[in-house]
Every structure is written in C-alpha cells, then in structure tokens.
C-alpha cells in the first residue's frame, strides 16, 4: 500500500525515522525498481543551518521545501550528482528528509548496469554494497534526477513510497557533510537501520 498524504504532514524528524524500512518504488524503462529505505537525514529550515531553507531562505531551487509534505525535492550537487529528498510538514514549513541509502530488492542487473555498466554477478562484494549506499548513488541506480522534482509521492506514478511492516532498530547520530553548519553539525538527525550493510556510514 502506498503511504498516504497524512504520513508526510508531520515534523521532519518523525518522517525521517518513519521512512526507515519503507519501500521506494521507481518505474523506469518499463522496469519496476524497489529499494528499502535504510538511512535518512532530517532538515528543519527554521532552526537548522544545514538546511537549504534555513531562516526562510526561498529561491527557485529551494521552493519545493516550502510545499506541503509528500512531494520530491531533487537537487543537483557538484555539477555531477543528484540528491533525493522527501518534503514533510505543512506548506511553508521548509522541512524535509534526505534519503541517504537504500537496500535494493530486485532487478539487480538493471541498477548494476546503471551504476557500473556491468551485470550484478560481475561485481565484487564491495561494489555490490556500493550500488545504493549513498544519496547520489541511489539516484544514479534508480534514475532519479531533476525531472522528478515536485513529484507527488503518495500517488501511484513512476516514483512513490510504499508502506512496509519491516521490524528494525534505529540508530540516531549526526549528519554527514555539513561542516559549515555551526551548531547544527551536532544535531543527531541522521537515522539508519542498525546492522544494514547498505548504510553509507556507521
């Protein structure tokens, strides 16, 4: 069952933790890709210097952050990579959760070819773990880019999130790659499933 709209209309911390174990579904090139969300980070613009929406900063790039929860926010970094976020809260809240890592569940050859131009069986053990163990890696594997910005995630389309009854222990720790964010560096707003091998950093 697809997660409903109400799931997303909550605080980013709740949504980021709640997304763990849920299933990201991508339909592309006639193929259905599914990945279990195993790592997320929360960003709350009103108090978070690491957020693109800190202090109400609104630009064309950050506008999705100010929409009602349940849409995709995809941005481009370093002129090379994309990152996929799930917007949370009410309109104008400036909140969201970065999807940091997935555990791929099917169509391994497709995502392996996307990432490494090799079939899954040709990959080393290390490379198999690296298919989707980072925000840009999962975007490459699942073909997520700027065309997916603003997409509604609570309706069936080519990008949505399904519920799951996954049981797991959640680890809470600091976020990655935000050395500029002053006191927000220490916020324990990164969440991951304990002992999952696809987590980007433990």
From Swiss-Prot:
Pfam families: Pur_DNA_glyco. It comes from the Bacteria. Keywords: DNA damage, DNA repair, Hydrolase. One of its GO terms (biological process) is base-excision repair. It is an enzyme of class 3 (hydrolase). SUPFAM superfamilies: FMT C-terminal domain-like. CDD domains: AAG (cd00540). Its EC number is 3.2.2.-. GO terms for molecular function: alkylbase DNA N-glycosylase activity; DNA binding. Belongs to the DNA glycosylase MPG family. NCBIfam families: 3mg (TIGR00567), PRK00802.1-1 (NF002001). This is Putative 3-methyladenine DNA glycosylase. It comes from Clostridium botulinum (strain Eklund 17B / Type B).
């Amino acid at each position: 069952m697809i997660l409903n709209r109400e799931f997303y209309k909550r605080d980013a911390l709740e949504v980021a933790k709640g997304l763990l174990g849920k299933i990201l579904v991508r339909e592309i090139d006639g193929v259905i890709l599914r990945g279990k969300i195993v790592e997320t980070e929360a960003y709350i613009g009103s108090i978070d210097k690491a957020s693109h929406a800190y202090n109400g900063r609104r630009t064309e790039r950050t506008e999705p952050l100010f929409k009602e929860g349940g849409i995709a926010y995809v941005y481009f970094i370093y002129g090379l990579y994309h990152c996929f976020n799930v917007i949370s809260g009410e309109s104008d809240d400036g909140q969201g959760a970065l999807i940091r890592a997935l555990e791929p569940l099917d169509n391994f050859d497709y995502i392996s070819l996307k990432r490494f131009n090799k079939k899954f069986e040709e990959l080393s053990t290390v490379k198999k773990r690296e298919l989707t163990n980072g925000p840009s890696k999962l975007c490459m594997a699942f073909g997520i880019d700027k065309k997916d910005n603003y997409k509604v995630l609570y309706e069936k389309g080519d990008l949505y999130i399904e519920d799951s009854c996954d049981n797991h222990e959640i680890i809470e720790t600091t976020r990655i790659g935000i050395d500029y964010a002053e006191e927000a560096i220490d916020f324990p707003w990164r969440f991951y499933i304990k002992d999952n091998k696809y987590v980007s950093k433990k």
